[in-house]
């Protein structure tokens, strides 16, 4: 048989083997899809029941259903390993196997897997049920939604906002801290067992594309793209930041620095994530009709149902389908109030089996009107790819899923669209001033959040990678917040806090970079869809409603789900394979030009040194080595606790004896910041149970003077080695060393005297010997005057010579 015949037979055999493996894999996946549909639905339904009615029974039901689903996935993942990916040619089959071969959390031992589920459920419950009570009336308590969020959205009272901001983090963040520490360890273990560097790397894997010619994309490339696009966005953000700072100075003149960072609790919501609610304080041309249509919605008696029906009309107008009847029957669109505890954070649900729902405690505001479009965008995506195999029913990447609803929000927010649905009056006229008002409102929501998103995820990536030690989480968090976002903590937070976990997405295990990538995608999509809609004019004026051409272009991409690489899906819509910030910058170009003109006489950027509590802070410097030498002790958290307790004692004593007031200051009321390794820090004091009431520095100084010696004694230091900068040393005796100083001085003086006497004695003896020797060697005839008959002493009787003293 010829060589070519052998080669042909070999190729046939290999093809047959591959065909057999692929056929077996297809059969396996068909069986998996059928079984997964039922188990996933039961698990999702149990999770929905818990999120809409938080009870112990529903927690247990959710855990049981989740355990069954996890066990099934673990078993199927093991079976999927039997099919080598390199021998699979069919891309659809290959992608499904690739997804299933990822073990996820099932790679952990049974005990660790259960512990991780318990941690996740507990964090979710703490977040959703956390409440803050009035210190003066413990029966008056507020949940995050609507109570605390209402304060953070609308209050102009600096101290009330500070109370809400700090109390949420103190009550919820501190509870979450030990759980989040465990979560990081277990998630990292899971990720590494799945062949990722850490959990952040595991999350970035959602963007990875391998083996698809020129459409490949690496996890490292995501980091590079995010960083370089952020640098392009920074100039616009810095000018927005400077403009907002100037307006906040008008509202809070004694609390803002004209060159400093923005206090975190003044930025429109609990986290400073979206600055939308700052619009009323920052509107450039207030005499123009208000483009925030909240009042119009209230006046026209809109409710949650109307809001979502209007969102549905928008999607239908571009050729996308209506919501299903089951959607309207099963969704929870309003807060049930005291009837049951619910997770109020807006979420869209694809439970499987054609069951799509939204959970949202909708309020009648323009912000929630746009949020409804966002959440319904998720549902449209879910419905579009429902025909895909189970494992490919997802967005091309997580950012795509978030972007779909945001595209619609860009159009729904335009004055043109708001006029068309009766929320702006028919005689509303657009001009340069209304254009700037509109773009500023959009920028507060869109541009203002980008550094927040980037910094949060960068911090988490560093934590998962081990680049931030656990005992420096909060220190690094606020350093990065100052440097990257230009936002400062209104009060210092130590390592008992867990401020990142006070955000829903962190405590509920969502990756966050999706909200950064989605923002870039949404403007790329918007530009492409506006072209399909034959829009002419600036991008920010485009409204794609009623354009079925734009809708069809979008729908073609949505239907792909995860069956094609996201780079290919992006290219199909926008003509490019990568993220591009240009459409976003084009959209905001008129605003950027206006902001630069407005900021001509303002400082653009921020100093990271300033803090809102600086004026009332006292700096402390401690010199342990110079004071105690080899007996110096280590300065650690226990010493800080002792210091805070000592100051609290001084405050109690001062207020009782000088002001005749019994105020029970505690160590938690002494706030320490800027702790440096060479032992220096700042502190200030707040009233018990009221962080917004800072005790004036002058009062604290008086209390310190009054108890200075007691504080010194607690640390075995004196006024020179325990310095309160700005407070003069007291007249009280310093801390006595083990041996009295006068004894030491006396001993030194006596030693010097004795040494002096000894030196004198030996010097005298030495000099006498020298003189005698000189006398003996002198020529006896040298000075004789012979004419005078001088006596020759050499012949005199030596007995007459007296010994010299």
UniProtKB/Swiss-Prot annotation:
Residues 652-659 are annotated as: Essential for cleavage by ADAM17. This is Angiotensin-converting enzyme 2. Disulfide bonds join 133-141, 344-361, 530-542. Homodimer. Interacts with the catalytically active form of TMPRSS2. Interacts with SLC6A19; this interaction is essential for expression and function of SLC6A19 in intestine. Interacts with ITGA5:ITGB1. Probably interacts (via endocytic sorting signal motif) with AP2M1; the interaction is inhibited by phosphorylation of Tyr-781. Interacts (via PDZ-binding motif) with NHERF1 (via PDZ domains); the interaction may enhance ACE2 membrane residence. It catalyses: angiotensin II + H2O = angiotensin-(1-7) + L-phenylalanine; angiotensin I + H2O = angiotensin-(1-9) + L-leucine; bradykinin(1-8) + H2O = bradykinin(1-7) + L-phenylalanine; neurotensin + H2O = neurotensin-(1-12) + L-leucine. Keywords: Carboxypeptidase, Cell membrane, Cell projection, Chloride, Cytoplasm, Disulfide bond, Glycoprotein, Hydrolase, Isopeptide bond, Membrane, Metal-binding, Metalloprotease, Phosphoprotein, Protease, Secreted, Signal, Transmembrane, Transmembrane helix, Ubl conjugation, Zinc. PANTHER family: ANGIOTENSIN-CONVERTING ENZYME, ANGIOTENSIN-CONVERTING ENZYME 2. There is a cross-link at residue 788 (Glycyl lysine isopeptide (Lys-Gly) (interchain with G-Cter in ubiquitin)). The chain crosses the membrane at residues 741-761. Proteolytic cleavage by ADAM17 generates a secreted form. Also cleaved by serine proteases: TMPRSS2, TMPRSS11D and HPN/TMPRSS1. Phosphorylated. Phosphorylation at Tyr-781 probably inhibits interaction with AP2M1 and enables interactions with proteins containing SH2 domains. It is a single-pass type I membrane protein. GO terms for molecular function: carboxypeptidase activity; metal ion binding; metallopeptidase activity; peptidyl-dipeptidase activity; virus receptor activity. A motif (LIR) lies at residues 778-786. Zn(2+) binds at residues 374, 378, 402. The active site is at 375 (proton acceptor), 505 (proton donor). It comes from the Eukaryota. PROSITE patterns: COLLECTRIN_LIKE (PS52010), PEPTIDASE_M2 (PS52011), ZINC_PROTEASE (PS00142). The modification Phosphoserine is found at residue 783. It is found in: Cell membrane; Cytoplasm; Cell projection, Cilium; Apical cell membrane. A motif (Endocytic sorting signal) lies at residues 781-784. It comes from Pongo abelii (Sumatran orangutan). Residues 614-805 form the Collectrin-like domain. Its cofactor is Zn(2+); chloride. Belongs to the peptidase M2 family. Substrate binds at residues 273, 345-346, 515. Its main location: membrane. GO terms for cellular component: apical plasma membrane; cell surface; cilium; cytoplasm; extracellular space; plasma membrane.
